[in-house]
């Protein structure tokens, strides 16, 4: 029981630290969402905003390939419909669970539509200065979160886990 208590305490302490870092994370995400065009940091900020607002898992290329299950970074253009300010996600997630999630956000809808307009079937990708397309990965999202938070936070910190107590 002592080990379980210690694990819960560590998780609780991490949640407190994440909560304290959240305002700075949100501020930087807001700045990056305002960038012109569709640079890497704008696409990463879009994924982080969606992590927070939808609680969709970040995703993993291996899961997508092996299990045909998706998360934010592995979504394809066909997994989201943009209608005005409405974003509607429909995809199979971890453990084969079907997800149907809708949010209304004019700014995110506009950015996601721009992402869909980039050639290729991956939703979250950007084109670099040399004209090369790059898909956003979970590693990219986690590195971005570490950079903007100044701490070792990851996409998993946005997704609620089992109860602490």
Where are the model-predicted features located?
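A positively charged, amphipathic N-terminal helix/segment that binds anionic biomolecules
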Residues: 1-70, 74-165
